[in-house]
Amino acid sequence: MNGTEGDNFYVPFSNKTGLARSPYEYPQYYLAEPWKYSALAAYMFFLILVGFPVNFLTLFVTVQHKKLRTPLNYILLNLAMANLFMVLFGFTVTMYTSMNGYFVFGPTMCSIEGFFATLGGEVALWSLVVLAIERYIVICKPMGNFRFGNTHAIMGVAFTWIMALACAAPPLVGWSRYIPEGMQCSCGPDYYTLNPNFNNESYVVYMFVVHFLVPFVIIFFCYGRLLCTVKEAAAAQQESASTQKAEKEVTRMVVLMVIGFLVCWVPYASVAFYIFTHQGSDFGATFMTLPAFFAKSSALYNPVIYILMNKQFRNCMITTLCCGKNPLGDDESGASTSKTEVSSVSTSPVSPA
């Protein structure tokens, strides 16, 4: 084995030289230079500095403006809430541990930090699944003129948290475990060992199949069918121009969110799967650290995409920030068809704003 395994950790560094130490008790500067830990701390500070206000503002603006409280927006707000959990209970801890060069808070806090990081990522993924299903039902109409209402949205939100907990909670109760990963200043599921006391192998297989592959199969199926339906509707002119434009705007926004998730999380999942299937092989600490920390940027892109692509929300946000006035003078009633209320329509024309 080219690493050092302890009771609650695995350091990707052989202890033949006697340098390897517990990541809960000693700085891990033998894994990487101190400036790299400082760079990670600065990066986490940036994510906190931007991620908290952007996600909090998304929630606050929606509460302030009743017109934004549409069924589809419930799912988008769910994403913002999950991101806030990651920022408050994950990023703050990781920033401090990076500043110290090791996980100073001990194994219990490592489990908590790993839990919230996994929970936030899974809520985001399953929220994208719900959005994909909603787009598929509304546009492809496999259930006829189905209306996606508040009850369905609430059920969708509850579903995302149930599935996320089904992924994030098992390591807390003995099925696998959370340990420091990479440069040992952030925590995640144990992909590194086959410790029989924790059944890591079965958990990792379960997580990759149920909580990674299945969601993406659903997402790609829904958007594949959706693309065909949109092309057919455009060719047959079955919907009004405003309806088609409205549905396309919302769909484009959700597709961008899916692409953003792929860009952020696929590198991490790929490296984790490689480590799991090549346990004991030689790899550097930064090999897992870079994709793990890059995945944390997912807390930023969803609200940014939402703000940039939804003119009605953008106008409401500007009005809130400017104490009830919009200096840009944009008329919300003439806003782009990006209004997310289109999710509640069937075959009736869609108001562009």
UniProtKB/Swiss-Prot annotation:
InterPro entries: GPCR_opsins (IPR050125), GPCR_Rhodpsn (IPR000276), GPCR_Rhodpsn_7TM (IPR017452), Opsin (IPR001760), Retinal_BS (IPR027430), Rhodopsin (IPR000732), Rhodopsin_N (IPR019477)
Function according to Swiss-Prot or TrEMBL: Photoreceptor required for image-forming vision at low light intensity. While most salt water fish species use retinal as chromophore, most freshwater fish use 3-dehydroretinal, or a mixture of retinal and 3-dehydroretinal. Light-induced isomerization of 11-cis to all-trans retinal triggers a conformational change that activates signaling via G-proteins. Subsequent receptor phosphorylation mediates displacement of the bound G-protein alpha subunit by arrestin and terminates signaling.
Residue ranges crossing the lipid bilayer per the database entry: 37-61, 74-96, 111-133, 153-173, 203-224, 253-274, 287-308
Residues bearing glycans: 2, 15
GO molecular-function terms, A-Z: 11-cis retinal binding; G protein-coupled photoreceptor activity
Motif 'Ionic lock' involved in activated form stabilization per UniProt: ranges: 134-136
Cysteines joined through disulfide linkages: 110-187
Gene source species: Lethenteron camtschaticum
Entry keywords, A to Z: Cell projection, Chromophore, Disulfide bond, G-protein coupled receptor, Glycoprotein, Lipoprotein, Membrane, Palmitate, Phosphoprotein, Photoreceptor protein, Receptor, Retinal protein, Sensory transduction, Transducer, Transmembrane, Transmembrane helix, Vision
Keyword Magnesium: no
PTM text: Phosphorylated on some or all of the serine and threonine residues present in the C-terminal region.
Upper classification of the organism: Eukaryota, Metazoa, Chordata, Craniata, Vertebrata
Gene3D superfamilies cross-referenced by the UniProt entry: Rhodopsin 7-helix transmembrane proteins (1.20.1070.10)
Descriptive protein name: Rhodopsin
Predominant cellular place of this UniProt entry's protein: membrane
Tissues expressing the protein: Short photoreceptor cells.
Coiled coil: none
Extracellular side: 1-36, 97-110, 174-202, 275-286
Record-stated family: Belongs to the G-protein coupled receptor 1 family. Opsin subfamily.
Site (Plays an important role in the conformation switch to the active conformation) residue list: 113
Gene Ontology CC terms: membrane; photoreceptor disc membrane; plasma membrane
UniProt membrane topology term: Multi-pass membrane protein
Modified residues (N6-(retinylidene)lysine): 296
Cellular localization per UniProt: Membrane; Cell projection, Cilium, Photoreceptor outer segment
